[in-house]
Amino acid sequence: MINDTDPESFLRQHVGRTLGCIHSRPEFKDIKGSAERAVMDKELKSFIYGYYYYMISDSGRLLPHMFTATNEREFPKNVDQAMEIKLSSKPWYKIDENGGHSKFNHAGRICGAKFRVGEPIYRCKECSFDDTCVLCVNCFNPKDHVGHHVYTSICTEFNNGICDCGDKEAWNHELNCKGAEDNGRLEDEFDDHDGKISKMLESVLIELFDHFIDVFNQNIEPLTTIQKPLIAKLRYFIQNGKYNEQADMLRRLAYRNQYMDEEESQQQTPSTSLDPLSTLKDYAILVYNDEFHNYSQASAAIRQGGPDNKHIDLLTAKIDSEGRSLLRCSADIASLMGGFFSVQSNGLSCTITQWYEYLHQEACKYSIMWINDCLNIPNSTFQSLFRNAIGKVLCSKYEPFYQSIDMTSVVRDYFSDSYLSDDPYLYADHSVLGEGVKIPLGRHKSLDPGDISAISPILNKVIAEDHHEYTNSRLQYVLFLENRYWKKLRKIVQDLIIPTLASSAVHKPMFTDQLVEIFPHMTRSVTFMDREPQLTSLRESVVQLFTCPTTAYSIFHSGHFNYVIWSVIDVFVDFSTMDEGTLVWQRVQRSNPSKSYSISFKQGLYAVETLLSKITDPNLLLKPGEFIMIVTLCKLFNGAWKIKRKEGEHVLREDQHFIPYLEYTTSVYSIIQTFDKVLQQSKDHIDQRLLIGAINLLDSFLGHRNLSYKLYKDFEIIKFQISKERVSFMNPVHTLFSFLVQHVPLQVSIQVLSQSKDYLVISDFALRSVVLCSQIDIGFWVRNGMSVLHQSAYYKNNPEMSSYSRDIQLNQLAFLIEKNDFQRVIYNMLDRWELLDWFDGSVPSTETVYDDKISSIIQQFVAFLYQILVERDFYKKFDTLEETQLYNIKNAIIYKLYAEPLSYTDLLNDIPDYLTESVSQFDTVLEEVSTYIEPKGLEDNGVFKLKKELYKRIDSLRLLNMGNDFEHSATIVKSHLADSKEKRAKIIVKPQLLELDELDPCARELGSFTRTNLFAKLIFKLLKLAVSDSSFSFTYELLHLIHAIFRDDEMVNGKDSLPEAYISKPICDLLLSIVDSESGSFSENVVATADYLLDNMIMKRPTAVLESLTECFGTKYIADYKIRKANQGVNFEETEQERKRRLAKNRQQQIMNRFSRQQKKFMDKHEEYSAGNDEDVDMDGEDLAGELNEFHCSLCHDDVSDDFFVIPIYQNYSPVFLSSNPTPMEIYKPWHGFDNNEHLATYNTDLFYKKKENGASQLMHESTQKVLVSCNHAVHYRCFKHYIDKKRYSTDLFICPLCQTYCNSVIPVDTVKLQSGDRLLQQKLTGGLDESLLLTFSEYSSECNDEVGKIILSLKDSNNGLRLNRNDPTWIQDRFLTLSLQFSNNICMLEMLSRLNKDPFGTLLSGEEQKFKTLQNILKSLAVYTRLTKHTEENVLKFYEDIRSSNLPSYPFFRVVETVLRSRLSFKDCLQEVLVERLKGLTKDFGSFYRKYESELRAQTCLDSSEFSIVLKTTILGAGFGDQVEKHTLDLFYTFLISELLPTLRRSIILLKALKQFMTGGDDLDFNEKDVLSGSLTSESKEKHFHLLIRFLLQTDFYDLLMNSHSPLSPESSLVNAPHEYCSIIKLTDLATHLNTYVTNNKNITLREENDQKIRNTVNRLDYKICLICGVKIHARTDGLEMQKHMERCSHGSSGLFLIPNISQVCLYLSRPDCTVNISAPYLNSHGESGRNAIERGDLTVLNHARYEHLTRLWISNGIPGYISRVMGDEFRVAMANNRTFTRNMFWRPGAAFNAGGESSDEDLMNDDEFGNDDRPDLRFRQPDVELRINGGPFGGDIPIRLPTERGDIHDFFEFVQNMRGGMQGDGADIPTTEDIIEQLQGNAMNGFFGRADRNREHFELNDQSDGNEDGEDEEHENNASEDQDTEYSSAEEGFDFNELNNVE
């Protein structure tokens, strides 16, 4: 096929012609209906793919190497075969995805792989340049990151990117790619030695992209700039009958190419029609997606357009997902115009497009998709060649064989106004290519070199380019035309271009240069001309390109930074206005439904910030041109958002206009922070001339304001009143100015700024922000609503912006610069705080503008003055940047930890991000200043506590503590510094001022203004005001300020110095007034501080101060004061020597006092030895026979006995009863308690992974393996019925009224103790009884009448999920029989739990009190049923026969329980009978076991059987062994028997304890003077434990037991063939030691897969769960039902646990009601944190065995449902309501408490407070699996259960459901109560039973109404609810058939 003379030219012509003539192929030529279009779509894709692949295969030679999974016979032999369309067969070009993973390699290039949904995105804190550098699953090599902080995220549609592996700039050191490690370099057919393959690829790609550009160059109709005028033109032509003009315009808009022209010239025939539109054939209506309409609006518009597809929803869904869809097509264009205008009139974007053009656009789409498919071919050589070819073709100039049609004439003729004809930006503003099909001229600007000496308040002069030479590359064309593509096409174009070019070292610089060239075009396109601006490629391009330092430098050095920043500035300037002489941005007030303005604003600011952040040379940014451009952008937001205080009425609707200002100004602050960071990191390389020049530029700009002044005394101060005028919070340029000043010596700053016109003009704006925040904080702006309060808090407390602290620094500079004019600065400051009139006495404090808030504003004012004086970190000298960072980190940690210990995550969240960038620095400082406290329980996290000695460094009035109350903070500090209250009262919290030698020399004068007479006067007036009214809240802060002033004076002028101004003003008099004030007038802190300051003043200047005090208070008063102080140890006149002597004497007295206290404590402790106790001891401690047990109703809290008690229970199938073939690991593994074997962390064999069977066998399986769980909260039956009725619960679905535990049934309990319990038990243990225990129970159980008995017998068992039929066993519904079986199962479960203990033998009977109490309650219930039930022997025998045939693994022990309770035999005989039969069966089983594992058993370690060798040799003959048996075989047999029999023996001991507790109430088991607790259970090994139990229980030894087993087998024996029960430790699946293993080394963890065939790429996906029961990996499904599906497949019961590795959580799942709770996984990091917090920073997380054991115990004991109900609280009630009420649809909550990300932290494992959040708020509906009506109505009908109205967060939801059901069922029905129905059917027979005293009923009702867990308004709700029901209402008992009452005997 290839022409050898010029193959490239021939190939290009062939591809060009094929693409250009694709419309003429028979398969695609004619228009088609909706069904035909669907087929054509597949045909077009098949044609495109097959043709392209063949054209790049060198005539098919390379196809077998590209598609290795395809048989060579299926490949086409020539191009014609390649172009054949065969939809019926599998395409031959299918890429083998699974095979590709093993062959992945990107040797010699950057990986650049696009992340696919579900795949992990890896980041390494230590290795990466920044957070944008990521690795894919194929490249990530765990060996490179051992000990590093590796953290992952999951790729989603909105969180994606490309792999940076191989990019040297992305990583701090070279990485070893996993793909390169696994694959060697192999020679293949793609080695391109002669360049032939490259040229072939380039030729195909050139024509592909040229055709693509040609098609979309002519496709201008979708442009937003064209659509409106186009519609207007069409309407004008049609309305005025100008059909020729209409046809001409449509013809010029249609797509044309040279091949079409050739075809028309050959087929042209003269038209005879008079209708000009008849020449326009085959048109279609295309509807495009936009961001203006919702789903329903789009559907309505489409319906009006008359689509040819009746499935409107499918069309709408396609438009939403793909971005466009074809509505209908027709050969007659006139028939389409009505539909076209109908869709347009509804606002949807649509075009009327020729069929050929639509076909070519679709071909272009598949062409791009084909390129993306090629990028997945698993051949590294091909990938290198293909990617290089793509880069070369895209970055080269667009020079097609045939020039595309120039559309500029169409734009000029139809879509532009005449006055715009000379506009140079006409085509750019219409987003069309310019003349000659070139990139049109854009807005490229640069600063005028002659205007860089100052920053204009408006805009500096710029030079706009009138001509620009663009590269005109294919890349620029494809990006420029982007806003014409629809959603799907845009996405695949971006997936092609950005990863491919950004990952190429050769083409990445070209990509950058060409993108920056058209950056102005793309920015304006996104802003004004994009239908879907959120899909722009600009954002992703910026992320991939501008984050590269080399790229950033090239942009600056090439001068192209102008293009970027001026395009951003231009967009903002378009929305700016003049305000007080400056140009500032204002909120957009134009209609913008696409939100393109917001997207463009954010994108532009992000681009600038990203570029600046990658610059390391600060001089690039300080150059006048670049600096002015950056400031020009920032100054648009300097004071942009101004607010004015409102007066009068409160606002009805708060102003939310501040949000965009806040959002964009915050981004500007980020740019400034980035700018400062660049200066900090390269401080030694800063050109000081450039820096000073930048300061001068800002000084002149900020000082240019012409402000109004007013004359106060002799000083000109600025005239401004914050409470009356418009004022702004944020001034980012002032913040930048503060940063710059800090980078030069303070002396230089003062010299430069002293030349300012008036520095107060600059500092005053910062002062306004401070005052504004203070006024808002005190509630002075309350009329403006809450929004201003949020703004103020955001401004002050956002350390990332540093704005508030910078305002403080600018005001500090005012005192340093204006040091010769302090009075003016102070007066200006007082005026700005609006306190000047009060200060000069013009108005009293009560008549200022603040009225009653004067105290609060002065408190803020004093804090401001203190910060001006004390905040000196700005001037602290540091040698290195690291020293600066460590200092700031240390201060931040100290001030966050002093109030309370914090977890690591909470601490990080409270500290600015820029201080936590270096993890090592942060951790080093944290270790230095804090003490780590490990988590002590199962639910808490590790916390860090501040070291005690550091509390002395805390200053509660500093900026670091600004968010906390000063006095409260001081109290906390004092409480940590002193242990007793007396000591705390003496402690004075001192101001913390940096020493002068740590500061810049000029900073020593910062406090000079505080020593002036004017300032001393201010302090005096403030203190006088505080003394005049002790209720003022600023006194403590004011005293702290005075303390700081004295401390600063000491530092400057010496230790004994005291400012003269503070002596001349009688401040000391006021201090004494505070000290001697009445008790309670001032707080202890205030009095102590005042006393300290007064002492300090007297000590320094005793004469002057005492004279002032005497003059004020009188001589006698001061004399008394001196005496009082002397008594306190303060003598103002004593010498230094006298003071030392006095202190020594005091210390001696303290020592003697301490000794006396210790002596008294010793005597008190040993008082018993010195005094006798003659009190009598009450020896009568025994219980009376027949005494009632103490039962109290949980609802009415009464203990009356005329109503029987029931216990709420939860009973359900448990999967822990494992039946399986024995294995050596199970039999011979010793018990050492709960453990975890990382090497087994694959899957838990086949123990738990069992497919659920249907039918009778599954019913029997689940019915016989139920366990019963209870909270053991008793309740009267009548109270219970009333509770169920009122709450509208069902008896098989309710929660305990006391503890909110999920229950599904109740059991009645007897309240009478047995008489002579000890004697009976002793007899049963050894000698037997005259009758069975059950009959003995019945004799002592309480009497009840027949009616009560019938009620008790009607209580049914819970059969959740079981559908009974007439063939099912009757005993399943017999509560007595099922309870006896569940009693046995509960004991088995309790024994399994004890195996998890560290000492499984000694702790068998210790702990688990609740579970033993449950066993007692079951026995009490059996006692009740024994009296009432008269089972026929036939039913009982059938019951036991069914149990025997059900393969119940614990059947042997059930036989023990059954014979002990029902037979007259002794306990010993019952047990021995079972053990003997089991020995026979086990002997037989050992034979098959040995033969199966013979080779493995030869090396097995086991117990020594020497003591029993003789009898074992005889016994083993039954296993098929001969007489000569090896010693090792006997040892194996001996160990086998012990392992198999031990569980039954242990359970028998538990049975004994349960009987002992039930019959006697005691816990100790001492039979025949043998103490079980200290005897049989105290053993170190399984063997010793076994023999001790044998001796105790059977009063014999193992030898005799073996001998007894030699007797002949009884024909009735059923235990010989009993199923084998798993006898090792039962637990959840083994897990990896480190959770990170699942995340970072996923491929090395072999897990059983349970993936859905519809889920793709399962090998690399990380969004999976692990079933902790069976260890199966379950991949996420789109419908969120993966857990439910797994539970349906596996026999796990109704609840499950699923580990979610990627978020470190465990999902607890409950199937009925369907709900989930997410808790932290049992993994902890080094900081003691769990859950998301443990892994979000990449910390190594280790499995915590205690927490995992706790989860295991929760699972074994069937406690997950109860735990879920308690955690969910009200949400569980909603889940129950959904499960019972909705008969067709139900709210489906797949993750009721899922916590992924949000931003709240995971505090504790199983923290009930944290599980109410829902990260998946969307509610979906689905069909319920079961009928949601309960049977048991009074006349055979169903009971419709209505929802109760509940309080709490879901109150409104309950009301909604109630109203909905009321509307469905009607109103006015009278609902009878359960009591009414019973009385109606049974007469008054029940009156005696329910006849409790009135006081009890009243007590119950009152208590029920006040119960915190119940409704306080139940009466009201119940009355209201009764009106919404019109059907019969019966007893709440499910399955309660009243007709059966008369049949009960």
Swiss-Prot record:
It is an enzyme of class 2 (transferase). Keywords: Metal-binding, Transferase, Ubl conjugation pathway, Zinc, Zinc-finger. SMART domains: ZnF_UBR1. Pfam families: PRT6_C, UBR1-like_wing, zf-UBR. A zinc finger (UBR-type) spans 109-182. PROSITE patterns: ZF_UBR. Pathway: Protein modification; protein ubiquitination. GO terms for molecular function: ubiquitin protein ligase activity; zinc ion binding. Ubiquitin ligase protein which is a component of the N-end rule pathway. Recognizes and binds to proteins bearing specific N-terminal residues that are destabilizing according to the N-end rule, leading to their ubiquitination and subsequent degradation. This is E3 ubiquitin-protein ligase UBR1. It comes from Kluyveromyces lactis (strain ATCC 8585 / CBS 2359 / DSM 70799 / NBRC 1267 / NRRL Y-1140 / WM37) (Yeast).
